[in-house]
């Protein structure tokens, strides 16, 4: 995405190995998730397949909802949108779900205010830390003095860290992440998890609306040859908001294997 404050224009550069297109719109906003929108690409079979099978269109529709909730955007409301973890209609789809605006995986995000020549860069973790503001005019004006270490951000426009970082939800998400990695390691190394029953109970409580919580519990039981329990958790995973159709297909295939 590129923008010009002096021209009041924003556009998307869409690119594949064989062609490049510039997408613009006459609307007051230009939205983008992870699929092409230009005439050159929108009817491409790969793009159509991506829209049908990925989380991109779902996120786009959620973005439209959030813009309706925030009709007059400023840098703070944009940060709020980028940090949103809900699904469509505000549904709780679990923490870290790919269908959310904030999937709790991003290294950073950037907010630009071209007309005022300002930009904000998020700090760790996952767009939840402070957004630090920089002013292009002051940076370039003071450039000759940058021969010593000094802070060059505009602290007056810092966006505070998300209060989610102080919540029980954040603590549970950290538990969920570490527990999921422990399950993966147990499956890969074929080593048991100590106090497995208590461990699984804690894992399920840590992120109960996220489909992967149940999928990975099922995978752990499948690795232990406990197909009956694995099937129960695969079915539970299917009741949640799953990232894309390929994951749904995979889980349904695993359920069939459990019944062999």
Residue ranges and their predicted role:
Residues 1-27:
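Structured, non-membrane catalytic/scaffold regions adjacent to prosthetic-group chemistry
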Residues 5-10, 30-232, 236-260:
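C-terminus-biased signal that marks the final domain/tail of proteins
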């Amino acid at each position: 995405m590129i923008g010009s404050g002096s021209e009041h224009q924003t556009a998307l550069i869409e690119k594949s190995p064989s062609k490049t297109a510039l997408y613009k719109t006459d609307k007051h906003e230009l939205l983008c998730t992870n699929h092409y929108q230009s005439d050159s690409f929108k009817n491409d079979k790969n793009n159509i397949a991506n829209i049908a099978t990925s989380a991109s269109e779902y996120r786009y529709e959620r973005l439209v909802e959030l813009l309706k909730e925030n009709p007059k955007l400023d840098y703070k409301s944009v940060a709020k949108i980028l940090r949103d973890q809900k699904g469509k209609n505000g549904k709780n789809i679990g923490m870290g779900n790919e269908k959310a605006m904030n999937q709790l995986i991003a290294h950073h995000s950037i907010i630009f205010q071209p007309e005022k020549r300002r930009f904000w860069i998020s700090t760790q973790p996952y767009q939840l830390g402070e957004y630090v503001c920089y002013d292009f005019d002051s940076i370039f004006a003071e450039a000759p003095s940058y021969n010593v270490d000094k802070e060059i951000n505009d602290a007056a426009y810092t966006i505070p860290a998300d209060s989610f970082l102080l919540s029980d939800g954040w603590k549970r998400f950290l538990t969920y992440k570490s527990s999921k990695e422990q399950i993966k390691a147990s499956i890969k190394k074929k080593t048991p998890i100590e106090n497995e029953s208590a461990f699984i109970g804690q894992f399920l409580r840590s992120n109960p609306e996220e489909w992967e919580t149940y999928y990975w519990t099922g995978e752990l039981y499948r690795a232990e040859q406990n197909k009956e329990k694995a099937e129960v958790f695969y079915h539970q995973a299917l009741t949640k908001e799953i990232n894309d159709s390929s994951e749904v297909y995979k889980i349904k295939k695993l359920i069939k294997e459990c019944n062999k």
